[in-house]
Regions:
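Extended soluble regions of mature proteins
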Residues: 20-284
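Bacterial Sec-dependent N-terminal signal peptides
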Residues: 1-22, 278
């Protein structure tokens, strides 16, 4: 029995060691987003966790995004193109700074944020959420803390961008007790190094690689495709169309382009000056 257990542990260790850690990559993705008919739905409740509060989509039903992701060491850059406009997010993990650039309706603008800005904004949001939860509990409405995500690995496989991928399901439950499932197709052969930022840019930038999905960072591999539906009706489908590992990427790729009016995140609109409110059409 001990010999059998040792062999199992040895086999598991071999699999873990065989998983490649990638510190340079060029990734192309296609993301389809279907906006909710009612942006102020159940996701707006305290702890909904869907992150779509306060969004104004200007009557648009959806958005298709074509993105190119450059990753090298501590730097991640996401270039996204859609009918709405162009978007660039550059994340510098070494200096703990993220710059988001937008080109829409002939205007070039952007904002930058630091890790401290993110912590301050999160603390403010947590405080607002706690006050709302307290108000509901005083009304006799129980709001439970969000449960840890449950990841179910399956043996289903399919090929994506030339790679054999496996299927996993992430089950999450929000504070209202609503259960949602996200289907992930991942490649178990490699993961990105620690410097890779799945949260680049927040909002739509986050949606590219699922950085906003609870449990995504726990997947034992690299996400190649996912489908998610929020409790307010918002849907996101992302698929990797091309991936080049150990790509040759010039450092100039990560330089901030000229011609943009860039401000600190604290001066941008949205709750707490966070620059996170994503408005599609209409006035700010």
């Amino acid at each position: 029995m001990k010999r059998f257990s040792f062999l199992i542990m040895l086999l598991f260790s071999t699999v873990v060691l065989a998983q490649k850690v990638v510190d340079k990559a060029l990734i192309k993705t296609q993301t389809e987003i279907v906006f909710p008919e009612n942006p102020g739905g159940s996701a707006a409740a305290p702890g909904g966790g869907d992150g779509e509060r306060g969004m104004n989509f200007g009557g648009m039903s959806g958005l298709d995004l074509t993105s190119t992701i450059y990753f090298k060491g501590d730097m991640t850059k996401i270039e996204s193109t859609s009918d709405f406009g162009n978007n660039i997010t550059i994340t510098d993990r070494k200096n703990r700074k993220t710059t988001t650039l937008m080109e829409m309706m002939g205007k070039k603008m952007g904002f930058y944020s630091t890790d401290e800005d993110e912590k301050t904004m999160k603390a403010r949001q947590d405080s607002i959420r706690a006050k709302r939860t307290d108000s509901l509990q005083k009304m006799g409405i129980n709001v439970a803390p969000p449960a840890a995500p449950e990841i179910i690995y399956t043996e289903e496989t399919k090929k994506i961008a030339g790679y054999n991928c496996k299927k996993a399901i992430i089950k999450t439950k929000n504070r209202q007790g609503e259960v949602s499932e996200t289907t992930i197709w991942y490649n178990p052969e490699f993961k990105m190094a620690e410097g890779f930022s799945m949260n680049a840019g927040g909002g739509m930038g986050r949606a590219m690689m699922g950085g906003g999905l609870n449990g995504m960072d726990q997947i034992n591999g690299f996400p190649m495709e996912y489908d998610v539906q929020r409790s307010n009706g918002m849907k996101v489908h992302m698929v990797v169309t091309k991936i080049q590992l150990d790509a040759t990427i010039d450092d100039k790729i990560f330089e901030i382009p000229k011609g943009y009016d860039i401000k600190p995140m604290s001066e941008m609109g949205g709750p707490g000056g966070g620059g996170r409110v994503f408005r599609m059409g209409g006035e700010n």
